[in-house]
Amino acid sequence: MKPVKIGVAGPVGSGKTALIDRLAKAMRDRYNLAVITNDVYTYEDAEFLVRSGALPPERIAGVRTGGCPHTAIREDPAANQEAVEAMLARFLDLDILFLESGGDNLAASFSPELVDVWIYVIDVAAGDKIPRKGGPGIEKSHLLVINKIDLAPLVGADLGVMERDTRLKRGSRPWVFTNLKTGEGLDSVVEWIRREVLFEGD
């Protein structure tokens, strides 16, 4: 059985790497995991995951995209496809391969040739108007994660407004509020992966 490839996209600083770090630590005892990260000029996100102990270093790979990060996950995903193939050849028993895009704007989306499903991460610190601005990530991602809910009072963001606008933009598509610093909401993401991506029951 082929591993499921899960893309994780979102603006710079929204919490993409934090989400993968938390997911890896929550799921690694039950599933065989690997991660590929994208950065424009560095391997910073991959190095963070190695330092945090999310997974063994050989299960984490970094891709330097250069230029525009969304090109590397949609229009010209060759470098990522090569990294995916190398990881799959190295670990024949993978259950899940996470692929993190470089930080981008609200227009980013993954090529269906690169991932099976994708998660889009935004954060409350960017303001409560973000969901209503829409875009492929907010409207079309398989799961929307609204992170850093603890910052809402500090930045004057109204979570009720964000919830209303998210429901309007996404319809029946799932979404979740999280505070990845404390792990709040993480269980909902894990459960979504188990039920809706891996098609597992209780």
UniProtKB/Swiss-Prot annotation:
Q: Where does GTP bind?
A: G10, P11, V12, G13, S14, G15, K16, T17
State the compartments where it is located. Cytoplasm
The terms describing its cellular component in GO are: cytoplasm
UniProtKB keywords = Chaperone, Cytoplasm, GTP-binding, Nickel insertion, Nucleotide-binding
Sorted alphabetically, the Gene Ontology BP terms of this entry are: urea catabolic process
Q: What is its main location?
A: cytoplasm
Respond yes or no to whether keyword GTP-binding is given for this record.
yes
The UniProt entry, under CDD domains, shows:
UreG
Known function: Facilitates the functional incorporation of the urease nickel metallocenter. This process requires GTP hydrolysis, probably effectuated by UreG.
| Family membership | Belongs to the SIMIBI class G3E GTPase family. UreG subfamily.
Provide the protein name. Urease accessory protein UreG
